[in-house]
Amino acid sequence: MIDFKLYAITDRRLCKPKLIQDYVASLLDTGVRAIQLREKDLSDTELRSVAVPINHICKAYSAKLFINSNIGVATDVGVDGVHLPESLLDTIQKAKARNLLVGCSVHDLDVAQKMQVAGANFVTYSPIYPTMSKPNPAVGLKSLRRIVGALDIPVFALGGITPSKVPECLNSGAFGVAAMSSVMSYETGIDQAKNYLKQIEEY
């Protein structure tokens, strides 16, 4: 069940000098209830060592934890789900067979529909607005509305979304919003997470 509206995506480099597990705990303190552990440079062993304490923390807060791309580690650690890129479309059924929730990254309607048919529980659609972290051109709100209208699963808007842009994304049909750099910044991320949640609550 997808019962969260803000999907926080990690980048441990941004929250230094704080350890990522401590930073995630601070995010959960604000009311965030879904984390995607996206540390793609780590080996399986390293990822597992990070995921285990974060999973314990998430369970203490009744929050969901998704691991990016790595079905094996997700299964071993016992997290709630995985988040898969378009290139791993063929592994959705493998993840579902292991009772994992599946989120997928999509950038166009055709792939989004294929992900839904394959069994994805939700998708992130990006980039809605121009952003340094996404090389693709911004797709805009009109395209977001089109994707939402074509799918039966929740769509999370991602890419260049500041808290002030949350209402127009939700108004365009997004189930929620996803954010990485804005919520992972050591200096401002926690306050930004609060601002996202406030906009969602007031919508």
Where are the regions a protein language model picked out?
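Conserved N-terminal beta1-alpha1 strand-loop-helix module at the mouth
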Residues: 1-89, 94-122, 146, 152-153, ...
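Active-site phosphate/pyrophosphate-handling residues
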Residues: 72, 142, 178
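A short acidic, helix-capping loop that chelates divalent metal ions and anchors anionic groups
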Residues: 74, 129-134
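Substrate-recognition "cap/lid" segment bordering the active-site pocket of phosphatases
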Residues: 134-140, 145-147
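Generic secondary-structure boundary signal with a strong preference for alpha-helix termini
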Residues: 138, 171-172
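Short, glycine/charged-rich "phosphate-handling" switch motifs in NTP-dependent
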Residues: 175
